[in-house]
Amino acid sequence: MSLLNIFDIAGSALSAQSQRLNVSASNMANADSVTGPDGQPYRAKQVVFQVAAQPGQETGGVRVAQIIDDPAPDRLVFQPGNPLADAKGYVRMPNVDVTGEMVNTISASRSYQANVEVLNTTKSLMLKTLTLGQ
């Protein structure tokens, strides 16, 4: 593996973590969205990563394979005066776990920062390699 491959690998990680941050931000923004375009509460999303290695390579980058709906059930909130409440007075709310999303955001941010550091270290090594013969 050459040092140039590191740029591709770390770059793919930056892109994947950026998408993860976007999905988490969308989840938190819609944590209280009781109805969407289909009349149903917002469904939290999850990012599924996949190895993006070249055939025959043991190492490689990462890519977002898909963005799926979180299978967790909707939250039920007792609001008998709400026009969207069911016969028992419960309103179906999005299945967004705000605390979990904050943890996910911090994790994605740290991973992004770590990959930026990988790029900076690689750049520094390449510059030092160029000055070896001087």
UniProtKB/Swiss-Prot annotation:
Annotated localization: Bacterial flagellum basal body
GO annotation, cellular component aspect: bacterial-type flagellum basal body, rod
Pfam family, one: Flg_bbr_C
Claim: Kinase is one of the keywords in the record: no
Presence of keyword Nucleotidyltransferase: no
GO biological process: bacterial-type flagellum-dependent swarming motility
InterPro entries in UniProt: Flag_bb_rod_N, Flagellar_basal_body_rod_CS, Flg_bb/hook_C_dom, FlgC
Stored PROSITE patterns: FLAGELLA_BB_ROD (PS00588)
Signal peptide: none
Protein keywords: Bacterial flagellum
Subunit structure: The basal body constitutes a major portion of the flagellar organelle and consists of four rings (L,P,S, and M) mounted on a central rod. The rod consists of about 26 subunits of FlgG in the distal portion, and FlgB, FlgC and FlgF are thought to build up the proximal portion of the rod with about 6 subunits each.
Family: Belongs to the flagella basal body rod proteins family.
This protein's name: Flagellar basal-body rod protein FlgC
Species name: Yersinia enterocolitica
